[in-house]
Swiss-Prot record:
GO terms for cellular component: extracellular region. Binds 2 copper ions per subunit. The keyword Signal applies. Its EC number is 1.14.18.-. Residues 472-492 are annotated as: Disordered. Prismatic layer of shell (at protein level). Expressed primarily in the mantle with highest level in the mantle edge and lower level in the mantle pallium. Residues 482-492 have a biased composition (Polar residues). It is found in: Secreted. PROSITE patterns: TYROSINASE_1, TYROSINASE_2. This is Tyrosinase-like protein 1. It comes from the Eukaryota. It is an enzyme of class 1 (oxidoreductase).
Length: 492
């Protein structure tokens, strides 16, 4: 009887083991099929013609496709565009297909203020081209909308750095499909933070020559009168109290301190490091990145909609640049180690939402690293930039001494707002009346009649025009959470 019970028990265990092995084998087959499907789909997929897909993977892939499409509320054309960019990214980095040789890397990304005028104008104009509707679709808005679904997967955790690295890669790929010689530039906002006193509010970064004005509706620069989805106009409110630009001390800790030597020490909800100004423990590079979002204000302060301001791309390219400095510091192996204790949507093997061919850990791979030109320093003559200067104070013998952004005291406004304020929507008794021809002087009157249709006036006048324009629009309704600043710069 005992032998019979033992035999029955053994049969039951073997049956359970066989069932478990079958389930495991089924899961392995599913995973293999999924990888084959994704590879096949990304290289060949078009939602209007699925004949290129192996039948066994249609269900696997289409479930993912429909989920993302419904989440984003995208059309077939928009989804096809996103997948075409993913396909181009995979071919560039030969992910999942070792037969494709990696393409030669494009030229290094550099600080926006060190670009030549032609290079900078080409980049900005290409961004404007992406924004323009084509066949009923704005390619810019389609890419920007992808950020909407990334809050849980790409913020407040270890995947923040890798996800945004891939997001930059996708945006740059879209730019280069329009103009092959453009490369994203980064905005090193520590150079604006270092401006003395309260002068950072007058930084040349937020003027007509670079990103456009910084208070009220963006009325000048390459992105002037930039329309947001829903019809509102792009607005900013830079340097509000309770915010801060990126602090050099934080960047230097991440880039050079030998005690900070794992990715877990710089990501949100990781080990963190003490804030160099407040001493609070647990600071992260993501925390510091949040500060600049708040400093710019407007849609940049909104987590969901921040990519609708083109400044988003220049800020995040700098975030990626500093991460790359850190990766070079800690060396091979360590820099590709995804924080093992990350969980939930930030777990190493969790899918990278929006990039169906990747897991979170893939964002840390050297495959996606980019070359960067060093940030402007006094030793490299500030990159020969007319927008930067080498400060007189500080350790003069230090070759790594940072340059500082120049300030401006005037900017450009539409000429109609100066020559005919009532025609431009301002009453004769409004504050704009103070900035008519008699106030700005004969030389300004001459400039306002230039072919550009714009006049150079004081920053106060520029702010008045831009803020009045903002007041004429209904309040901007933004969905989802806002960024919060971890540091309050007492100078602003």
């Amino acid at each position: 009887m005992d032998k019979m019970r033992t035999l029955q028990s053994l049969i039951v265990k073997l049956t359970l083991l066989y069932g478990a092995l079958c389930m495991l084998q089924t899961e392995n087959v599913k995973e293999i099929n999924k990888q084959e499907c994704i590879q096949n789909a990304v290289y060949n997929f078009n939602t209007t013609d699925s004949k290129y897909l192996d039948p066994k993977c249609v269900t696997i892939f289409m479930d993912q496709y429909r989920g993302l499409k419904n989440l984003l509320n995208y059309t077939e054309d928009q989804m096809n565009y996103i997948f075409s960019l993913e396909r181009a990214m995979m071919r560039k980095h030969h992910i999942n297909d070792k037969r494709h040789k990696r393409q030669a890397m494009t030229r290094p990304r550099q600080e926006c203020r060190t670009l030549t005028d032609d290079a900078r104008n080409n980049l900005f104009n290409t961004i404007v081209d992406l924004k323009a509707p084509s066949n009923g679709m704005s390619r810019y808005d389609t890419i920007a909308g992808l950020h909407r679904q990334a809050i849980a997967n790409a913020h407040m955790g270890a995947n923040f750095l890798g996800w945004h690295r891939l997001y930059l890669d996708m945006f740059e790929m879209a730019l280069q499909e329009t103009r092959s010689d453009v490369v994203l530039c980064y905005w090193d906002s520590t150079l604006d933070f270092l401006m003395p006193g309260t002068s950072q509010v007058n930084t040349v970064s937020f003027s007509a020559e670079l990103f456009g004005n910084g208070r009220g509706v963006v009325i000048n620069g390459p992105f002037r009168f930039w329309r947001l989805p829903g019809g509102r106009t792009l607005q900013r409110f830079i340097a509000r109290p309770g915010s801060s630009l990126t602090r050099p001390g934080v960047v230097d800790l991440i880039a050079t301190d030998p005690r900070i030597n794992t990715n877990s020490q710089i990501v949100f909800r990781g080990q963190g490091f003490p804030d160099p100004d407040t001493g609070r423990p647990g600071h992260s590079w993501e925390d510091e990145h949040n500060n600049t979002h708040v400093w710019v204000g407007g849609v940049m302060q909104n987590v969901v909609s921040s990519p609708q301001d083109p400044v988003f791309w220049f800020h995040h390219t700098y975030v990626d640049y500093v991460w790359e400095l850190f990766r070079q510091k800690i060396g091979p192996g360590a820099r590709e180690q995804y924080p093992a204790d990350a969980s939930g949507p930030h777990a190493p093997d969790a899918p990278m939402i929006g990039f169906d061919m990747l897991q979170n850990r893939d964002g840390y791979s050297d495959e996606h690293s980019r070359m960067y030109a060093m940030h402007p320093r006094c030793s490299n003559n500030c990159g020969n930039s007319r927008f930067l200067l080498c400060p007189n104070n500080g350790p003069m013998a230090d070759p790594n001494r940072r340059c500082v952004s120049r300030a401006v005291n005037s900017d450009m406004v539409p000429a109609a707002a100066i020559s005919a304020p009532e025609a431009a929507g301002f009453s004769a008794m409004s504050p704009m009346g103070a900035f008519g021809p008699a106030a700005v002087g004969p030389s300004s009157v001459g400039r306002m009649a230039s072919r550009s249709g714009a006049a150079r006036v004081s920053l106060q006048a520029t702010d008045t025009v831009a803020i009045r324009a903002a007041m004429s629009e209904p309040p901007l309704q933004l969905e989802g959470p806002s960024f919060t600043s971890s540091f309050d710069d007492p100078r602003i």
